[in-house]
Amino acid sequence: MLQPKRTKFRKVQTGRNRGLAKGTEVSFGTFGLKAVGRGRLTARQIEAARRAMTRHIKRQGKIWIRVFPDKPITEKPLEVRQGKGKGNVEYWVAQIQPGKVMYEVDGVPEELAREAFRLAARKLPFKTTFVTKQVM
């Protein structure tokens, strides 16, 4: 699963997930999966969607993952009283804003790419849409 090799700080504050995304255009592949909603994408969800796509396209073409989980999420253990400091880092997330292209694929027919992205979208916690590269 994806996570940073090293970070400046072990834990971060919760923060908010506002604004519009960068990386809204398909830049590496021909087809992309774009977020319509906003939310957190865990490293496990990123990997589950990647596996679903890879299994469907069966080693044809190439897949790019355009998101990286760089925010640590902490949790306290079960049945522990409040206080006594912040909990331990349990998992990593990528903050996703509307318009972000999360996955791209190239070298496969459009029907195959659509079905692969449909399977991947089932693993994600918000709505997505299929996009194609704009040719100038």
Swiss-Prot record:
SUPFAM superfamilies: Ribosomal protein L16p/L10e. GO terms for cellular component: cytosolic large ribosomal subunit. One of its GO terms (biological process) is translation. It comes from the Bacteria. Keywords: Ribonucleoprotein, Ribosomal protein, RNA-binding, rRNA-binding, tRNA-binding. Pfam families: Ribosomal_L16. The keyword Ubl conjugation does not apply. GO terms for molecular function: rRNA binding; structural constituent of ribosome; tRNA binding. HAMAP family: Ribosomal_uL16. Belongs to the universal ribosomal protein uL16 family. Binds 23S rRNA and is also seen to make contacts with the A and possibly P site tRNAs. Part of the 50S ribosomal subunit. This is Large ribosomal subunit protein uL16. It comes from Vibrio cholerae serotype O1 (strain ATCC 39315 / El Tor Inaba N16961).
